[in-house]
Amino acid sequence: PGFLMGQIASFLGAGFLGGMIGGYLAGYIALFIRNHLKVPKWAEALMPMMIIPTLSALIAGLIMFFVIGNPIVWATNALTNFITGLDQSSKGVYGFIIGALGCIDFGGPISKVPNLICDGLLLEGITEPEAIKVLAAMVPPLGITFSLVLSKVLKKPIYAAQEVENIKVAFPMGLCMISEGVIPIAMNDLIRTCICTATGCGVTGAISFTLGVGSKVPSGGVFVIPAMSNPLAALIALLAGTAVTGVLLVLIKKRRTGDE
């Protein structure tokens, strides 16, 4: 059923929104059928392989074609036209929002929403949000690593010994666009860390969008920067966000010593 919803969305021109909504619709209909449809004993074995998929695909397909298809097409076109019609100042604002939300919980459920939208826009041929997603995902681990280096230079220790070891692991993960490595570090000072990393990611997103950086590759970290439409601007955006994150962390985190 989910595959069929994707094909219907493509046929209608509903884009990624149509595929996403259609997939959820088919899934919930299948769940409803499984929980509420009673069949004879001899047909129970057919439920998971034939009855549920057939009925859910039929019902969801009819709803997509005749009820929600056209509104989704309109919403997809409106979103595409809105993104492509942004001026430079607006790009900075929306780039900041996309970047900040895309890493606010280090790859958790909140960041999945804007990242999914970026992936969908990539399917529509809009590559700038995808570049923000790739670059911003690297900022938390790189920014925290930079804050460790900066704190040593300024002789203001802000991380305990175990956190330092975790940062050594998080840094190479961050280069590969895996921001989850900073979660053990962030959990020790969650609010301050989230504020600093979200700000840094927002700066990266704003610079990237304003300078027109685009990425046709949805993942890969630093290894896909050469494939972006403006690699130098992408590198500038990444370094700027990293620097902002690191400086803010050194400024607002409390001094720590040893394994405190």
Where are these regions (language model features)?
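Pore-lining transmembrane helices
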Residues: 1-41, 49-259
